[in-house]
Each structure stands twice: as C-alpha cells, then as structure tokens.
Amino acid sequence: KFLLGSHVWMNSEKLENNSKLRTVLKHGTLSIGFIGLAETLKALIGEHHGESAKAQKLGIEIVKHMREKCDEYCKEYNLNFTCLATPAEGLSGRFVAIDRSIYGKIKGVTDREYYTNSFHVPVYYKTSVKHKMEVEGKYHAFTNAGHISYIELDGDTVNNVDAFEQVVRIMHDSDIGYGAINHPVDRDPVCGYVGVIKDVCPRCGRREGEGVEMEKVNCYDCSNC
C-alpha cells in the first residue's frame, strides 16, 4: 500500500480505487520465499544438509524445484516470480510455535524456538567455515530473489588479516553470491569505546566492574564531538 500510494512503482500514479494491479506489479517482482530447509530435511530423512551428502542432494532437489516453479509462473502469468532465501527472523519463531502447537515437539524439527533461515546450516551444528560455505553455496544460484550466507567469528580479525582473506576466498570458491562475516564488537559503557575489548579497555584502561573518573569521561565525550 505504501509503495503504491507513494507512487514508487512505475504506473502506480495512474491507479484509481477500483484499478487492477497487474499494470503495476509487472514492473516489480513477486518473490516466493522459504525458511526451514534444515528442519524439513530432518523431518523427511532424519538428517539436515550439513550432516550428510544424502540430505544435501535432497535439499538441492527441493530448492531447485521451487526455482523451476517460479520460472514456470513467469512464463504462465507474464510476471516476475522469483525464489527468495528468506532471512525471516520474526517469522521463524512464529511458525515453529504454530507447528509445535499442532504437531508437538519433534526432535530436530520443532524442539527449538525458531526455524533455521532459508537454506542455512543450523547455527547449533558444529562445522568448519569451508564445509558450511560449500554446502550453502549450492543454493545461491537457485535463489534469484536474494540470498546470504554468513559465518560467525569468535575473535578479532584486525591482527589476522590473512585469516579474514582466507574466509573471503572460501566464499568465492564456494559460489557464494552474497557473503557476510560477523565478528564480536564490544562497547565500554563508561567511555564509549567501540571495538574488541579483552581484559582492559584500550581507551580508558578500565576493567569490567571498575569505575572511571568523571573528568576522563568528559574528556572522551569531547574527543568524539
């Protein structure tokens, strides 16, 4: 409603109260998204795609079929249907709660508070960066409406640029269309320093639980102005 009412989409300024939307929708995309591939595979064969080649093969077949249906709809309706690897942070929790109320708690499927986003390997599954990217990279070509694969680093890469570059190259070699690298960022609530803080804040020298003189805090605040 916002996009149409604000005339963001081409030809939306010509719409009247009883107008059909085809003339406007044809300029945009109609994305069919999905979450929970990992849980789907657990329900079907007892393993997700990070655990076995058999599950990976089935997962690829499922997502490939979804993409093919989107392509069929494009030709049938002459509209831009696309397949979306959905990052549904809110929906993943809502859907699993609904399914649990209907089907009960199923191990590996509805026993957590969320479904895994899109085709991601579950975050609770211990694996290597290389394996995770190799598994997820197979799905990027099918999800033409958007996709993302990311890894979580447990340390600071500022002093280890080679490791950071290696991760990027692994993503490239795994056909990752859109990759992200998350790393920890701390914030000192007293002096406001943002970065990786180990035992001592590199700006004010404060340790966890210690205070700092107000004059120093004011000095830090002024330096950020």
Q: What annotation goes with each model-predicted range?
A:
Residues 1-225:
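Long, C-terminal-biased catalytic regions of enzyme "large/alpha" subunits
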